[in-house]
């Protein structure tokens, strides 16, 4: 009985602490940085530049571990400014510190309008048309026309504007810089995976808005 009482009391104490926002918090966050798994093209370029030991290790579960990362320059980390015990000056590292509602709106802007719907649409058609790189798809005028219509014509009129990022400028960067980037090789096959599970959130919100 004594042990049970202690266990129950301890659990209730932990629960009460978790519910006390003056002591502990669980800030919302949104991150946007396209980072595919290490690509052979990048590895070959690094080796060509006389950088050694660039060959990735592939685990038994087909996880790639490499000394380099395929990553793009644009990056957005939006965090709810809710730290009851203080925090470092994350703004100095480019982090957007804001309220929970703005974090949520930024996520909705990206996922339902300005990036993910474009990415998914072009990837599905890219797979059907035999493309293996997103940047190569961006040389196809029909695919570019498709994502521009999705973003600018259908998306922008109903976009959720978070206030800290301007939706049109965000799409401009996606279409003009991020997707055409040949130095960040990404496969439409990766993006198109599980598309059936993504349709609702990536296209449904825009449809509902109309």
In which residue ranges do the predicted regions lie?
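Catalytic cofactor-binding cores of redox enzymes
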Residues: 6, 25-26, 118
């Amino acid at each position: 009985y004594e042990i049970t009482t202690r266990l129950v009391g301890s659990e209730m104490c932990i629960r009460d602490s978790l519910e006390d926002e003056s002591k502990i918090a669980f800030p919302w966050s949104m991150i946007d940085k396209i980072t595919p798994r290490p690509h052979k093209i990048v590895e070959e370029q690094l080796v060509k530049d006389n950088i050694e030991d660039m060959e990735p290790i592939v685990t038994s579960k087909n996880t790639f571990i490499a000394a380099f990362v395929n990553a793009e320059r644009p990056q957005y980390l939006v965090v709810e400014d809710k730290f009851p015990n203080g925090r470092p000056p994350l703004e100095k590292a480019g982090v957007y510190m804001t309220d929970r509602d703005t974090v949520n709106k930024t996520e909705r802007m990206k996922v339902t309008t300005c990036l993910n719907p474009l990415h998914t649409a072009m990837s599905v058609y890219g797979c059907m048309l035999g493309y293996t790189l997103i940047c190569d798809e961006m040389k196809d005028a029909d695919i570019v026309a498709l994502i521009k219509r999705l973003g600018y014509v259908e998306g922008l009129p109903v976009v959720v504007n978070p206030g800290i990022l301007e939706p049109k400028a965000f799409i401009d960067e996606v279409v003009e810089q991020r997707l055409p980037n040949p130095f960040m090789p990404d496969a439409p096959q990766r993006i198109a995976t599980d598309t059936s599970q993504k349709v609702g959130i990536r296209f449904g919100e825009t449809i509902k808005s109309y």
